[in-house]
Amino acid sequence: SIEGVNSPNPQGRVYVYTNSKDELEQLRKKGMNIMQEAMIVGPTAALMLLSHNTPIIGFFAETNIGIPDSRAAAEAIKAIDKYLGLKIDYKPLLKQAEIFEKSLRELIDKASRAQEEKEKKRLDYFG
């Protein structure tokens, strides 16, 4: 399973969970961040609860909740690639993240300037 986990200040970390002792040892050997505790809900939680006899692995990337997070997706793919050694190219997602983040910053700046202008006009009207 691949999921995002809300983080107020994402640092690009990906946490991994498994119910298999053998897989846990492999994850540790590869330097993966092992999930110590978390609140997991939805289909992933259901799968985890029902997987008593089936080994599972979950990758949980820190994300900015509420906006598409290409950077978190790239970090999740990077972690999966590190674990499986598939040589997946995650760089296009990082490029897309840069483009999206730049557009988002420009939009926020534009909205901020519009709000300041609106406030200035309101003060001019009352003052």
Regions found by a protein language model. Name each.
Residues 1:
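A glycine-rich, hydrophobic loop/mini-helix early in the fold
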Residues 6-127:
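Accessory terminal and edge-of-domain segments that mediate assembly/interaction
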